[in-house]
From Swiss-Prot:
This is Putative cytochrome P450 cyp-13B1. PROSITE patterns: CYTOCHROME_P450 (PS00086). Cytochromes P450 are a group of heme-thiolate monooxygenases. They oxidize a variety of structurally unrelated compounds, including steroids, fatty acids, and xenobiotics. May play a role in the regulation of lifespan. It comes from Caenorhabditis elegans. Its EC number is 1.14.-.-. Heme binds at residue 456. Belongs to the cytochrome P450 family.
Amino acid sequence: MGAIIVLVVLFATIAGYFKWIHTYWRRRGISGPEGLPFIGNYYDLADVNKPRGYLIHKWTQKFGKVFGYYEGAVPVLVVSDMDMLQELFLKKFDNFYARKSTNHIHGNLECSKSEPRINLFTSRGARWKRLRALASPGFSVKALKQVHDVMEDSAINMVDLMAKHEDGKPFNIHAYFQEFTYDVISRLAMGQPNSELFNNSGVEIVKSIFMRTHRVLPWYFTVLFPQFEHLVKRMFYNHAAVQGGDIEKLLLICKKTVESRIQEREENAKLGFENAENDFIDMFLNYYSEQVEDIEFGSTVEKKVTAEDVIGACFVFLLAGFDTTANSLAYASYLLAKHPEKMKLAQEEVDTVVGSENVSYDDMTKLKYLDAVVRESLRLYPVAWFACSRECVKPTTLGDIYIDKGVKIEADVMSLHRSKEIWGENADDFVPERWLEPSSRHTMSWIPFGAGPRQCVGMRLGLSEAKTALAHLLRRYDLVAGVETEKELNILGCTTTSPEAVTLYLKPRI
């Protein structure tokens, strides 16, 4: 009897604690959606079949530009006020340098000795600053010019493989873009020597990572009790969400590649051979050290990396370089097929600017309308909204709202990108021309890659890759929407937004 009373009292105490936590925003005069007991709004937001970005957009329409919700015991503030976002991403970066985690079993995100999963995307503090400084040269204009031929070779091979669909039958063009982007990033980041479209086993592994549900028991426990995350990790050690599943498979691929390259470079050094810089692995290994001590955040960065750093970098490059660009290409192709008059304008520009079979890097900079097509596609279908989230690491204010340490902030990218206040009455329409004239729009009006110091380091690579692929595709084919083409795309994903399929027809250009 005594034990039952203790359990009842314990349950009542825990229930009371969560009831109090879930008044956090109301006590500050901020509205938001009602959640479930204990877990708050987490269940709704963890559905792979209903991307959270679209649900948050729906909530914004109901509650306004600033509202709050709960992931278990953690208050989350959603913002689509551009001045507040400028504070978040730029003016008060030191208070919000941490990105909101995509994995609730992540380990210490600021520790230099953590597992490779603590990478450029997830890391914080001094470790993030060091990794960012090391990665940035690989995405400079000079570096992009050097790797352009690799991107173009994969793009040509992709379009050649599409020739089988000249028979007038519908096909899922998104699958080709997924193969293309994985091929490119494998060659740039992992040293894959040649194009291997539709022969890369890693494609299915990466696809499954992005399509996995977040409704798993260990994650429920960690959103309920974030302070006991490490205990949860030990309790569920054998659970796939903790072991990693496909994440662990991809990390193993990266680990084998990096360790093999380290051994190769050591052997070359013994023989007196100079190590060439062929890919991102070599770029990072030029700063290789068996052990690194991160200095205090905000100080000068020491450019050194461990093997775990390089493995983590390869891992995040494979994931980020695969999904976002493939999805961007799929959305752009869908919109062009639905708007043939816009496609013709893009084709005319490509025909005029590109004078030979090759599409050079300099050609890319001249394809203004094609660039506008990609940017407009990313406006209508933002793919990486999670890059636009932060966690408060030092108490401060955002606008006139006091933000405690540990509170999470999300930008509602969809509401920004579809705002008639920003983009006019045709905000829901595909109008690439809006990008061709100088604009006085707020810097936070278009943020598909995030903003501020933590803006996606691979943004220029992704845009260049997308334009290269589209230029080669549009030179040879018309993209046609037919009876099998989706009237509305079915969007999936917990971390990024991906179309289930984009069914189009190819028509060879005469």
